[in-house]
Amino acid sequence: MINDIKQLHKRYRLLVHLSNNHVYAQIIDDLNNRTVLSVSTLTPQVKSKLSITCNKKAAELVGEYVAQQALNFGIRNVVFDRGRKLYHGKVEVLANSARSFGLKF
């Protein structure tokens, strides 16, 4: 699946990872094999606004912050990579939050 994303889309990739305790989002440049930016519930700006770091509110804040940072870097269009997670719950909330703050995918 990742190879399909790399070959079909020459765009940045928004990778979402959920652990039992935290929510992570990264913008990856697959052409140059580097991570452009990374935001998680461990990021000080996000962590200071949360009391619980593994719920939908946390996912919403991570989506908002990753979209703001991406727009600061001049990144508007991304490919959404949810990994093996279903597009439901925290993944869906993060995606909708990133979309509402200006990312297009």
Swiss-Prot record:
Q: Which InterPro entries match?
A: Ribosomal_uL18_bac-type, Ribosomal_uL18_bac/euk
Gene Ontology MF: a single term: structural constituent of ribosome
Keyword set includes Zinc-finger: no
Query: What GO biological process term is on the record, naming one?
Result: translation
Cited SUPFAM superfamilies? Translational machinery components
What are the entry keywords? Answer: Chloroplast, Plastid, Ribonucleoprotein, Ribosomal protein, RNA-binding, rRNA-binding
> Got a GO cellular component term for this one?
chloroplast
- Where does it live in the cell? Plastid, Chloroplast
UniProt cross-references to Pfam families, sorted A to Z: Ribosomal_L18p
Q: What is its main location?
A: plastid
Which domain of life does the UniProt lineage start with? Eukaryota
Q: Sorted alphabetically, which CDD domains does this protein's record hold?
A: Ribosomal_L18_L5e
Tell me the protein family, please.
Belongs to the universal ribosomal protein uL18 family.
Looking up NCBIfam families in the UniProt record yields: L18_bact (TIGR00060)
Describe its function. Answer: Binds 5S rRNA, forms part of the central protuberance of the 50S subunit.
Oligomeric state and interaction partners are given as: Part of the 50S ribosomal subunit; contacts the 5S rRNA.
Provide the protein name: Large ribosomal subunit protein uL18c
Q: Which organism is it from?
A: Cyanidium caldarium (Red alga)
